[in-house]
Regions:
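Enriched for short, Lys/Arg-rich terminal
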Residues: 69-103
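Basic, Lys/Arg-enriched alpha-helical interface segments
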Residues: 1-64, 82-84, 100-102
Length: 103
């Protein structure tokens, strides 16, 4: 069995997640914890299978992948870092935005 990679979250992604969670709790009372639940699920997937997300072609940084969270309609943008090997979540971006996140 493969070991889970540690996951770091950038300051930008932390702020985006907080904003999304605040909005979601106010506007989606039937599923107030959906953002957190979907992020936990995504983290579980990418920590074991870093290549699970599609290559992010809508940003200028190379090596970035994105995983779609269909239930909440957000993308998690992340990349694999080495030495030590780990995942960094770079952005949390709603699918309705016309362009990619500011990376």
């Amino acid at each position: 069995m493969s070991r889970r990679l540690d996951i770091e979250i950038s300051d930008l992604a932390k702020a985006q997640i907080r904003t999304a969670e605040d909005w979601w709790r106010l506007n989606r009372p039937k599923a107030p914890n959906a953002i957190r639940e979907e992020l936990e699920s995504a983290a579980s997937i990418i920590s074991l299978q870093p290549e699970a997300g599609a290559r992010a072609l809508n940003i200028s940084l190379s090596g970035v992948r994105r995983l779609h969270l269909a239930r909440v309609r957000y993308y998690v943008y992340y990349w694999l870092l080495t030495d030590p090997q780990r995942i960094e979540i770079l952005a949390f971006w709603h699918e309705s935005r016309g362009s990619g996140p500011p990376l």
